[in-house]
């Protein structure tokens, strides 16, 4: 199982520099885990940056995968991981969800870079 972080979805949606690296993970919907928190972040970002209709279409795409709601067990696990790794709430929930389901987090978010069970896709810096 793979959990693509919100930044990966946005990279793919905007055809950013790492879109091709995220694409294969997003296309394997039978092996893709989507926390409801990622759905929230996508809906908020897409509605703000584009429009609500596109946001609803993308949420529909996420529902072709295995959607995982935040429950008490995940919340407590996320709290422990946040304290252990100094993660923000959203990152901790995403990481806890992946760990609870034996999934690999695929992300370009540097907050995850040194965590186990993470495939970190480094953004290329432009030369000066």
Please describe what each predicted stretch is.
Residues 1-34, 46-57, 127-128:
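Short, well-structured N-terminal submotif of metal-dependent ribonuclease cores
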Residues 9-10, 39, 112-113:
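A generic structural signal for short hydrophobic patches within well-formed alpha-helices
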Residues 19, 39, 55-58, 71, ...:
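A general structural signal for well-ordered alpha-helical segments in protein cores
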Residues 28-29, 61-65, 101:
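Structured helix-beta-strand junction loops
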Residues 33, 68, 121:
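General small-molecule cofactor/ligand-binding pocket signal
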Residues 67-108:
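Active-site neighborhoods of divalent-metal-dependent phosphate/nucleic-acid chemistry enzymes
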Residues 95-128:
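Acidic, PIN/NYN-like endoribonuclease modules and their adjacent C-terminal/linker elements
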């Amino acid at each position: 199982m793979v959990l693509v972080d919100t930044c990966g979805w946005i990279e793919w949606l905007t055809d950013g520099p790492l879109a091709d690296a995220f694409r294969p993970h997003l296309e394997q919907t039978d092996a893709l885990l989507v926390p409801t928190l990622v759905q929230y972040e996508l809906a908020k970002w897409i509605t703000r940056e584009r429009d609500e209709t596109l946001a609803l279409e993308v949420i529909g795409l996420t529902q072709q995968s295995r959607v995982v709601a935040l429950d008490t067990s995940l919340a407590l696990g996320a709290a422990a991981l946040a304290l252990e790794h100094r993660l923000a709430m959203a990152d901790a929930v995403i990481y806890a969800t992946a760990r609870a389901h034996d999934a690999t987090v695929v992300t370009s978010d540097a907050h995850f870079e040194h965590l186990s069970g993470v495939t970190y896709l480094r953004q290329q810096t432009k030369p000066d």
